[in-house]
């Protein structure tokens, strides 16, 4: 008996011979025809695997002349064109809702439309006034300007009495500086109003080409009225005493002679004359 894959054993039994398992060797290069195209869309892969069979359209059996015919165009008169507009009123679907407006008083401030201005002194910038004169420049201008211009500016700003005293102080031969003026004002109670007025005068002088026109300026007139309301009755007398102590050189005698001449000429002062000693009321001789 011829056995190929089995082995004969005693007693007539047979035993199968086990074959060694051999793994199939992988191909180094796969066939390109069996590779699907690289595409992320699965529809393209399915289309490649199962291509449609009925994508070829059949030709029509009837000729075109049997169902197609030429229709001539209509001649339209351009000058007689009428447009029919239907007389339909289009209304909104939702009803119009009316809201009751809140009552706004005339003196109320609307915070939504008007910006909130910070408190006085914070973030204030001078945009319109870019050529403000310093205190030294204002003093130099008053000392070098003619007497009638200096008197007009000072009397319109400080009044007749105090303006006349400051005109004598600025126009005299005492070489007044801003440091000396601050020293005189520091002794006088309420003398800070003079620095405020001269500082405001620097604004007006920096914006005007001709200083004589400042007298006709309504803003200058309003500024002078506000300054004169804040001047105390004893300010002129205190300035005369402080200037005589700091400057000397017969300043009080000069003021006394000027005031006596003005009083004899019938000049009306808006304020009372300062109390000057009788010994000082005499003509000042240089």
Curated annotation (Swiss-Prot):
Residues 1-41 are annotated as: Disordered. It is found in: Virion. GO terms for cellular component: virion component. Residues 14-36 have a biased composition (Basic residues). Residues 1-12 form a propeptide. Its main location: virion. Keywords: Virion. Belongs to the atadenoviridae p32K protein family. This is Structural protein p32K.
